[in-house]
Amino acid sequence: LPRHPKAPMNILFIADPLASFKTYKDTTYAMMREAAQRGHTLFHTLAAQLSVQNGSVVAQASQIQFLGAKDDHDHAWFQAAPAQSLALTQFNAIIMRSDPPFNMQYLYSTQLLTLAEQQGARVFNSGQAMRDYNEKLAILNYPQFTAPTIVTTRAADVRQFLAKHGDIIVKPLDGMGGMGIFRLRESDPNIGSILETLMQLDSRTIMAQRYIPAIVHGDKRILIIDGEVVPYALARIPQNGETRGNLAVGGRGVAQALSERDREITQTLAPQLKARGILLAGLDVIGDCLTEINVTSPTGFQEIMKQKDFDVAAQFVNAVERNAQAV
């Protein structure tokens, strides 16, 4: 991809602790590496280190020197300067990469980011977009692309849905990495206890979807960057006997070209996501069905970059450079 020559920028990454990164597969690491190679200055903070002082949104942020990992388990890939209190408007771009769960604390972070945006900061993805797009519920806007789905707090509704379809998946609305996802069949003796646990006795909203048999071939992560679709999807193939393809639970990632159906889905979603201030989204597709729209911290860059001659991180940093603010 062409590198856009740009004046060096100050880029703040709001991300989990850097020493916890698995550098051989971490997407935020790939973003930082690309930005550092272009001469941008990197800073890091945690979502919990955002605050409001004298009306300004500030972060306790450390400037990061990117050294690069020598091997897969090298945690000394960066050097962090002592943290200092910096207003978010002092950065050309702020990249929000904190992992879900999207709990109240996460919600407050996005509200502070929205306040910073009102003060002139450029945040990717925007705080508003992250609030608007619950990763599970967002698919309900696109029924033409989804499997039969219900959202409910009532176990009786789920039982009725199960009786209709015979084989379903149930999942919480705030999970990540495959947590809390169950497959239920009518013959399952544990239906009652699974629903009680998951729905906390009719007090927690969940989603149920008809089981999609194509999951045995994995689900696909399709990346959309600033309205442009990355031409390769990352198929996540479940381990034998496992319902979930998530890489976090041992799925295997295989990069592959997009199918015709993938293109049909992305043609509809890409311009809408861009219009909503979503610079980076990860669509999850199983077979022909859209199952999730990830906007909080989509991954998959490195697997695609290693398997195909396509630099996803360069495409992403190009998009950040195009959309950043002059400070």
Summary of predicted features, one role per range:
Residues L1-P8:
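Short, Lys/Arg-enriched N-terminal segments with co-localized hydrophobic residues
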Residues M9, I14-A15, F21-Y24, N240-G241, ...:
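ATP-dependent carboxylate activation and anion-phosphoryl transfer catalytic cores
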Residues P17, S98-P101, L173-G175, P298:
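Short glycine-rich anion-binding loops that position phosphate/pyrophosphate groups of nucleotides
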Residues A19-F21, K25-R38, F43-V151:
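Conserved N-proximal alpha/beta basic substrate-recognition cap immediately N-terminal to
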Residues T27-T28, A155-A156, A163-D167, G177-I265, ...:
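Phosphate-binding site of ATP-dependent enzymes
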Residues A36, E117, L162-A163, K274:
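Anion (oxyanion) recognition and catalysis
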